[in-house]
From Swiss-Prot:
One of its GO terms (biological process) is dephosphorylation. Residues 160-302 form the Tyrosine-protein phosphatase domain. InterPro entries: Dual-sp_phosphatase_cat-dom (IPR000340), DUSP8_DSP (IPR048035), MKP (IPR008343), Prot-tyrosine_phosphatase-like (IPR029021), Rhodanese-like_dom (IPR001763), Rhodanese-like_dom_sf (IPR036873), Tyr_Pase_AS (IPR016130), Tyr_Pase_dom (IPR000387). It comes from Mus musculus. The lineage of its organism: Eukaryota, Metazoa, Chordata, Craniata, Vertebrata. This is Dual specificity protein phosphatase 8.
């Protein structure tokens, strides 16, 4: 061992004091104590080599040198070529011969012997030297970085009252209970961040607030931060001073002060911590509270981003309604809403009695539709997004009451805008003595003897699929047909319609009309080539439709035909005794066509080639609501005849298309 091989040099306190007083060129004094002991007090101009287990092991393994352990301020002395005297001391060692071989001081001395010519140990250590020569001892602050070594609040505060802002003070329980100190600083509001600290007697209840939390790693201080900031602002608005305190003014109250600086001054959590730390160095929020400050910082950033983008994204655009002279576009209701709306419309039209010359009733769905429009306008959906949505599923809702009120009905509908939402379809169910021509109603303001043809819609190109958001659907019946109000989409009967082999009369009975069956290869949906020239495609659910000539199954027959349509995708059909069998439908149509007149044929041809006039207001509300939902994209790139055959096989209907009796 080095201690056994050569006796250690020793130096007493007096000799070291004389060398230190001699000025520059004195010995290199090394302090082998811990950093905490060295930081509190040490010999003048001494260098600390921390006696830790890590440093000891690295010295034994030769992974660190003495020059690397000595601070850079004294490294020039180590690298000097002239001989250097070294004095090593610990806390209280008097005899180096009694040191253990594996002690830190023994290992350090052996390493110093290999670097320096003269290495001595101070007799009695720092305890003896500091008692004899306190003037040659000094203490300096810790060279720690500006970070928090989290620890619980100390029972006794290290400093007194601290002023953070002109109206905000940070202190401890002792400071708050000192009435003279509080009066001297003009503090009249107290924010107590503890469970145990009492309320001062000289502070009224209205100026006192308690946050019942403890200083541990489980408490939630974040929910209390906004209330605390409001309380501090209340004192500021009253031109008073407020003190935030806990037991020692180190952790809980410091966290609240940091949060207040973050909120009011717009600082980050790090900057706010340094702001408070510079004014009260003793603060040390625990890691739990520091993490909650980071969460609070994120919430403040999110709030600031929302406030910045609020005028552009948060607030909806001003809506253009009837007051501005522009009607709001309507959206199709769901299947259940459409059926319910149609039932309510029929009931209201049957039971209500509007005054003659008065306006039509306001649709009941207007408030809900307006609220939905406001929500959708706030979303700022682009036209491309709307088109993508329309391609997935297209819903046609034939809600006449909500879509064609006289106050909202446009006189000249133009071509649909691809960026608009899907429009509601029109179901023409005319009443009166002629097909497609509504009879004037006494309670309708538009009751005039003559009729005006409605401008037809332009058919989209054949290459593009049927994507028009507005479609027309017509249900046309004979002269003696009546319309009886019914609810929903249930099976309907037509007591006024003549059956096969029965004369048409008001007292004749006809079996109930069945819904058209699902298209099949034996009885598919038939497409009329007239649709290419007319306003839209004409469909027949019961038989083939000829190109406009009267005959069996044609829409021009008196009681057995069915037809109508427009807008590129609507159609309807109805027969005297309806059946999914096309042969029975044809025979029924043939017997009915024999009693038709040529004038009736001409009128019905005119109806097929043009749009009928808008029906009266009372007839509108008696119509039925029918909704068809189908998937599109299956008919692209096929011939028109093949399109309808594929459509009959692949299209799924959410509700059955019923033949509706009219009055």
């Amino acid at each position: 061992m080095a201690g056994d091989r050569l006796p250690r040099k020793v130096m007493d306190a007096k000799k070291l004091a004389s060398l230190l007083r001699g000025g520059p060129g004195g010995p290199l004094v090394i302090d082998s104590r811990s950093f905490v002991e060295y930081n509190s007090c040490h010999v003048l101009s001494s260098v600390n080599i921390c006696c830790s287990k890590l440093v000891k092991r690295r010295l034994q393994q030769g992974k660190v040198t003495i020059a690397e352990l000595i601070q850079p301020a004294t490294r020039s002395q180590v690298d000097a070529t002239e001989p250097q005297d070294v004095v090593v001391y610990d806390q209280s060692t008097r005899d180096a011969s009694v040191l253990a071989a594996d002690s830190f001081l023994s290992i350090l001395l052996s390493k110093l012997d290999g670097c320096f010519d003269s290495v001595a140990i101070l007799t009695g250590g720092f305890a003896t030297f500091s008692s004899c020569f306190p003037g040659l001892c000094e203490g300096k602050p810790a060279t720690l970085p500006s970070m928090s070594l989290s620890q619980p609040c100390l029972p006794v505060p290290s400093v007194g009252l601290t002023r953070i802002l002109p109206h905000l003070y940070l202190g401890s329980q002792k400071d708050v209970l000192n009435k003279d100190l509080m009066t001297q600083n003009g503090i009249s509001y107290v924010l107590n961040a503890s469970n145990s600290c009492p309320k001062p007697d000289f502070i009224c209840e209205s100026r006192f607030m308690r946050i019942p939390i403890n200083d541990n790693y489980c408490e939630k201080l974040l929910p209390w931060l906004d209330k605390s900031i409001e309380f501090i602002d209340k004192a500021k608005l009253s031109s008073c001073q407020v003190i935030v305190h806990c037991l020692a003014g180190i952790s809980r109250s410091a966290t609240i002060a940091i949060a207040y600086i973050m909120k009011t001054m717009g600082m980050s959590s790090d900057d706010a911590y340094r702001f408070v730390k510079d004014r009260r160095p003793s603060i040390s929020p625990n890691f739990n509270f520091l993490g909650q400050l980071l969460e609070y910082e994120r919430s403040l950033k999110l709030l600031a981003a929302l406030q910045t983008d609020g005028p552009h994204l948060g607030t909806p655009e001003p809506l253009m309604g009837p007051a501005a002279g522009i009607p709001l576009p309507r959206l199709p209701p769901s299947t259940s809403e459409s059926a319910a709306t149609g039932s309510e419309a029929a009931t209201a039209a049957r039971e209500g009695s509007p005054s003659a010359g008065g306006d039509a009733p306001i649709p009941s769905t207007a408030p809900a539709t307006s609220a939905l429009q406001q929500g959708l306008r706030g979303l700022h959906l682009s036209s491309d997004r709307l088109q993508d949505t329309n391609r997935l599923k297209r819903s046609f809702s034939l809600d006449i009451k909500s879509a064609y009120a006289p106050s909202r009905r446009p006189d000249f509908p133009g071509p649909p805008d691809p960026g608009e939402a899907p429009k509601l379809c029109k179901l023409d169910s005319p009443s009166g003595g002629t097909l497609g021509l509504p009879s004037p109603s006494p309670d309708s303001p538009d009751s005039v003897p003559e009729c005006r043809p409605r401008p037809r819609r332009r058919r989209p190109p054949a290459s593009s699929p049927a994507r028009s958001p507005a479609h027309g659907l017509g249900l046309n019946f004979g002269d003696t047909a009546r319309q009886t109000p019914r609810h929903g989409l249930s099976a309907l009967s037509a007591p006024g319609l003549p059956g096969p082999g029965q004369p048409a009369g008001p007292g004749g009975w006809v079996p109930p009309l069945d819904s058209p069956g699902t298209p099949s290869p034996d009885g598919p949906w038939c497409f009329s080539p007239e649709g290419a020239q007319g306003p839209g495609a004409v469909f027949s659910a019961f038989g083939r439709v000829s190109a406009g000539a009267p005959g069996p199954g044609n829409s021009s027959s008196s009681g057995g035909g069915g037809g109508g349509g427009g807008g590129g995708g609507g159609g309807g059909g109805g027969g005297g005794s309806s059946s999914s069998n096309s042969s029975s439908s044809s025979s029924s149509s043939s017997s009915s066509s024999s009693s038709s007149s040529s004038s009736s044929d001409l009128r019905r041809r005119d109806v097929r080639t043009g749009w009928p006039e808008e029906p009266a207001a009372d007839a509108q509300f008696k119509r039925r609501s029918c909704q068809m939902e189908f998937e599109e994209g299956m008919v692209e790139g096929r011939a028109r005849g093949e399109e309808l055959a594929a459509l009959g096989k692949q299209t799924s209907f959410s509700g059955s298309v019923e033949v509706i009796e009219v009055s």
